């Protein structure tokens, strides 16, 4: 009867009448357990011993999350807590669950002592394997981090008293590259792949004005000279003979007899040559090299490098003769856009071609890269490594540009802008002589700098504009300068603008000179190209300092061009 009644009911009604618990119970128990285990295994990370490291050459990541350290809670650790600070993983062992159940692995005396003095046994256990535990704790600290802690003390001593030791963007990119180091995850370029065949490295450093390009290529050059000095056998033998001569002469100063001693084996054989377009840049680069390499004149190989005069007044063939001995291994061309221009290109090409067989590094440096120079480098140096900063061809944003329409009458007074050191640039080959005299007659200390200025006077004029030290004069010195300025003006002016210096210069002072003290630049003529805009306004606002530029616009000048340059400066865009 039951079988017949059950067979007459449809399957849908039968499944609806069956309790849900029966369906759940009918499922196999291993299915849910297996699915849970699969989900748990999918989310679980593989042990580190089973995974190969992908940073063998670079070391472990320093930003990887680390396991938090167990620290004892302080007296206020339970304040402002909403959940009890209870470790759920740590279970309290019930009494009687110790090793007593195992059949007496320890004797009764030890067990009685532990029950009577629980603290004593715990301290004894903690003191066991103390050295191994300390070693295990130190193992988690990478060796590189321990070395960094030691190196920090060296850096503090080396860089003591210096301000702004943080490298600039171009230095952060160029110095490791010139030393043969990779930056981050830098890929191997065509130049690196072709290096074993050509045995020469070629670099282009392109960065904005006042960004520290000189030190970016000068420090690796000094490092190369020191490495070459350590490997030079003739220089080592010369040092031994020199030390013996010092002992023989006793305490006699070396400067008194070094000229009579034998010449250095690398005398007049320069290992590094830096080409610059003007003599002012020669003095500047030489001063920077001596400042960062103060012992260069006392050491042998370095002394031979700097023993040549800072300026060589000779035809090109004389410089070519100096580098014909195949000793020069490094050559740097500063202001490459000028030296590869039509006026300097023939002489520069001769020097580079003559030094090319022995060169190991060729460095080109410039703040502006015209298309002509870009095409020249692509044709003659196809494997050159280009290192450029994001702000290339842009005037620093901390430099403000003002425009004055001189066609309007009356002209606003300009003496209010002379708040500090000043640079006054214009495009003619020689500024009118009446300009400095006119400023002097107004009580302003002004000088003129052009191609007819004697060279010994040029360095003296630029000293006060290239220093970072503020002008601190006593009242007596200020009064003496005032009387001297009034006497120079012929007694025309009865006033004197103290702590202010003005230089009236041509484009001679617009290239490469590190005028750190200049805060204002007045452009008498509107520049014809954006290249001139970048270099002239780049005399102010160097190394992140503030500055201001003023352009005098006449009725025949393009005001729309100046307006676009001003807008680009405000937006921080490149003048392309």
From Swiss-Prot:
One of its GO terms (molecular function) is RNA binding. Residues 1-35 form a transit peptide. Pfam families: DEAD, Helicase_C. Residues 194-387 form the Helicase ATP-binding domain. Keywords: ATP-binding, Helicase, Hydrolase, Mitochondrion, Nucleotide-binding, RNA-binding, Transit peptide. InterPro entries: DEAD/DEAH_box_helicase_dom, Helicase_ATP-bd, Helicase_C-like, P-loop_NTPase. The keyword Disulfide bond does not apply. Its main location: mitochondrion. It catalyses: ATP + H2O = ADP + phosphate + H(+). It is found in: Mitochondrion. A motif (DEAD box) lies at residues 334-337. GO terms for cellular component: mitochondrion. Its EC number is 3.6.4.13. ATP binds at residues 207-214. Residues 38-48, 55-73, 99-128 have a biased composition (Basic and acidic residues). It is an enzyme of class 3 (hydrolase). ATP-binding RNA helicase involved in mitochondrial RNA metabolism. Required for maintenance of mitochondrial DNA. The Q motif is unique to and characteristic of the DEAD box family of RNA helicases and controls ATP binding and hydrolysis. This is ATP-dependent RNA helicase MRH4, mitochondrial. It comes from Chaetomium globosum (strain ATCC 6205 / CBS 148.51 / DSM 1962 / NBRC 6347 / NRRL 1970). The lineage of its organism: Eukaryota, Fungi, Dikarya, Ascomycota, Pezizomycotina.
């Amino acid at each position: 009867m039951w079988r017949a009644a059950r067979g007459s009911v449809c399957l849908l009604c039968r499944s609806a009448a069956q309790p849900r618990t029966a369906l759940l119970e009918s499922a196999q128990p291993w299915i849910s357990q297996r699915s849970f285990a699969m989900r748990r295994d999918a989310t679980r990370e593989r042990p580190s011993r089973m995974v190969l490291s992908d940073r063998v050459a670079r070391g472990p990541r320093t930003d990887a999350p680390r396991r938090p350290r167990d620290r004892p809670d302080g007296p206020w650790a339970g304040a402002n807590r909403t959940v009890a600070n209870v470790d759920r993983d740590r279970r309290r062992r019930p009494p009687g669950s110790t090793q007593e159940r195992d059949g007496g692995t320890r004797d009764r005396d030890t067990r009685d002592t532990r029950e009577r003095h629980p603290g004593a046994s715990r301290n004894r256990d903690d003191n066991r394997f103390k050295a191994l535990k300390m070693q295990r704790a130190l193992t988690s600290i990478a060796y590189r981090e321990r070395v960094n802690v030691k190196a920090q003390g060296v850096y503090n001593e080396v860089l003591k008293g210096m301000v702004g030791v943080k490298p600039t963007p171009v230095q952060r990119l160029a110095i490791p590259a010139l030393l043969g180091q990779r930056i981050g995850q830098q890929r191997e370029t065509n130049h690196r792949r072709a290096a074993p065949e050509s045995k020469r490295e070629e670099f282009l450093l392109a960065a904005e004005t006042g960004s520290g390009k000189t030190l970016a290529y000068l420090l690796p050059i000094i490092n190369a000279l020191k490495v070459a000095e350590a490997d030079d056998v003739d220089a080592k033998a010369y040092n031994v003979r020199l030390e013996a001569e010092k002992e023989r002469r006793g305490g006699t100063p070396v400067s008194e007899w070094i000229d009579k001693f034998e010449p250095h084996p690398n005398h007049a054989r320069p290992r590094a040559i830096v080409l610059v377009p003007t003599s002012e840049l020669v003095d500047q680069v030489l001063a920077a090299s001596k400042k960062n390499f103060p012992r260069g004149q006392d050491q042998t190989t370095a002394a031979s490098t700097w023993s040549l005069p800072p300026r060589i007044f000779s035809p090109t063939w004389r410089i070519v003769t100096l580098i014909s001995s195949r000793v020069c291994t490094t050559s740097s061309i500063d202001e490459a856009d000028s030296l590869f221009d039509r006026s300097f290109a023939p002489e520069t090409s001769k020097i580079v071609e003559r030094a090319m067989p022995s060169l190991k590094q060729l460095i080109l440096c410039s703040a502006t890269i015209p298309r002509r120079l870009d095409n020249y480098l692509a044709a003659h140096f196809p494997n050159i490594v280009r290192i450029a900063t994001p702000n290339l061809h842009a005037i620093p944003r901390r430099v403000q540009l003002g425009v004055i329409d001189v066609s309007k009458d009356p002209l606003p007074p300009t003496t209010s802008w002379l708040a500090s050191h000043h640079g006054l640039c214009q495009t003619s080959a020689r500024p009118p002589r009446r300009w400095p005299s006119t400023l002097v007659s107004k009580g302003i200390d002004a000088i003129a700098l052009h191609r007819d200025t004697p060279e010994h006077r040029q360095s003296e004029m630029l000293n006060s504009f290239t220093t970072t030290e503020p002008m601190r004069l006593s009242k007596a010195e200020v009064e003496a300068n005032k009387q001297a300025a009034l006497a120079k003006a012929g007694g025309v002016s009865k006033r004197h603008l103290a702590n202010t210096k003005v230089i009236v210069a041509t484009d001679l002072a617009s290239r490469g000179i590190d005028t750190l003290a200049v805060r204002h630049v007045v452009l008498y003529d509107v520049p014809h190209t954006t290249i001139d805009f970048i270099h002239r306004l780049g005399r102010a606002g160097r190394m992140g300092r503030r500055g201001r530029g003023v352009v005098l616009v006449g009725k025949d000048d393009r005001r729309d061009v100046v307006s676009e340059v001003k807008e680009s400066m405000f937006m921080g865009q490149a003048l392309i």
